[in-house]
Amino acid sequence: MPDIATRRRFLLFLVKPSHYDDEGYVIQWWKSALPSNSLACLFGIAQKCMEDQVLGEDVAIEIFPVDETNTRVRPHDIARQIQDNGGFGMVGFVGVQSNQFPRAIDCARILRAAGVPVVIGGVHVSGCLSMLPERPDSLNQALDLGISLYAGEAEGRFDEVLCDAAAGTLKPIYNYLHDLPGLEGATGPYMPPERVGRTLGMISSFDAGRGCPFLCSFCTIINVQGRKSRYRSADDIEALVRINVANGVRYFFITDDNLARNRNWESIFDRLIELRQQGIHSRFIIQVDTACHKIPRFIEKAVAAGVKRVFIGLENIDPDNLAAAKKKQNHISDYRELLLEWRKHRCITYCGYIIGFPNDTQESLVQRIQIIQRELPLDILEFSILTPLPGSEDHAKAVAKGVDIDSDLNKFDLEHVTTDHPRMSREEWQEAYRLAWRTYYTPEHIKTVIRRAVAGGPRPDTVAYLLTWFWASFHFYNIYPLETGMIRRRYRRDRRPGMPLENPLVFYARHWGGQVVTYGRILTMFAKIHLWMRRLERDPNAKNYTDEALRTSDDFDHQEMYQLTEAARQAGAKAKRIEEHKHARAPVAEPVVEAVK
């Protein structure tokens, strides 16, 4: 083997791009909220290629992972480093979503002008090639710049890309959509601890499985990762956890779209429970469906394994809207029991709610959110705009019908209206989104959720922190909370091409002055909530608090959720019949007669 000092260096930059805010500045933070699992997957795969010396014994691959949500990307500097290395290197933009594609192209344009090989992969490329009969302008623009496109997953295939890049023979398109790899025993995701440290709470990620069996029309996962699920084994997960814990990382986001439908969930949870018994304690955030509480032992074992927070795709409380989106697996009669079960185990629930289904109006939206506030014991409600994302059935149908869709991909972030609605103008729809956040995150309801937590739910201080964070994300940043972080970074020269470069005096005064005012108001709000919560915790009657949402059973005849529409009434009536049938079949206990002595 050649001496390490004499080996050639191949510089591999793996970049997870961010996207632009409404003023054209890259959304970036000192510490970001969530990690990028795509970046972790590619880093792990690239490390394996490095260890296997896929470019030959005389070549050392140096890998530089960059998450732009917490690290500034300087394309000119990257180009200079690769040029100084004799042009021997490559930049891969990984996990690029549709809203991140314009930013990736803007960076790639600079790199390509310097002759740097560039590959872009992710859900936008994969979704477009999977669902559209013709390549859209966005992909053709990339190809015209000499950028290579990668569709599909990289396990077992990335060495081909590296070899082609090293040889200067990158193909225009690498398409592995119809050859998805198995995950058991595959190289797992990994991020160096110094990169993980750039996230709030030192949180890393991994996927225990990919693919989803459901048919939601707004979803891209089923058309990119497939409807046939693939899984990692308990051994794989144990190895991932052990290597991270050895490096000081104990908090993980398991990114499976629906962990409850991972057939290995029980063996994985059992293994994590064993690790905890050995003193290896980790915490997890997971995503599940609305029927996971019906799976025997699922919630109990999830909690025993270390699950603390749960994302649930509630999406809507109108059965007609759910049916229109092919979300037929969601039954509104399951919602209360599901949420109460997670609450009983002191887990924080995050629930997604989509705005823009066919029956939605501003008035109906406010009505439904107020019903949720009163009748469902959830903690965090996350709003998103129904968006025809490239790669989804909704987008493919819209394109086929010639529907007017916004051409600016930067808006495809689930926060901006990108097409027309049957009952609202685009402006009204956008205002409905803002109205949703204002309606749910009122000081009064924030206190109600904390009261429920103090009365026997998840940790009240964590709930108070999260509620304040979500409230602040909308009120001060107008950014989806999970895209926010701690201390906003804005760089004057990192503005979207075509937008003017601001005067330095104006820019820095506005940026830093705004930071001071914003954080002052956030801290004031948090202090008020925190002090109020401490007083509440000292109240001996606080543990006895109850309200309609904390009822242990549904009142199908009187709850407003079951009176909204005819479909809702039918759902309530059906659930009531099932409950009555269960009670009728329940064995009647015989009276116990004590023996007479």
Question: Where does each model-flagged region fall?
Answer:
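Radical SAM enzyme core and accessory elements
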Residues: P2-L14, Q83-F88, I110, H416-K597
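Acidic, low-complexity intrinsically disordered segments
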Residues: P2-N247
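Conserved beta-strand positions
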Residues: L14, F93, I120, I254-D256, ...
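A structural motif corresponding to the C-terminal end of an alpha-helix
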Residues: A46-A60, L145, N247, A305, ...
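Short helix-capping segments at alpha-helix termini
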Residues: Q53-G56, L111-V116, E274-H281, H345-R346, ...
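Short acidic/polar active-site loop segments enriched in Thr and Asp
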Residues: G89, R250, K308, L378-D379
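Radical SAM [4Fe-4S] cluster-binding motif and immediate context
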Residues: E184-Y350, I355-F357, T361-E363, Q367-Q370
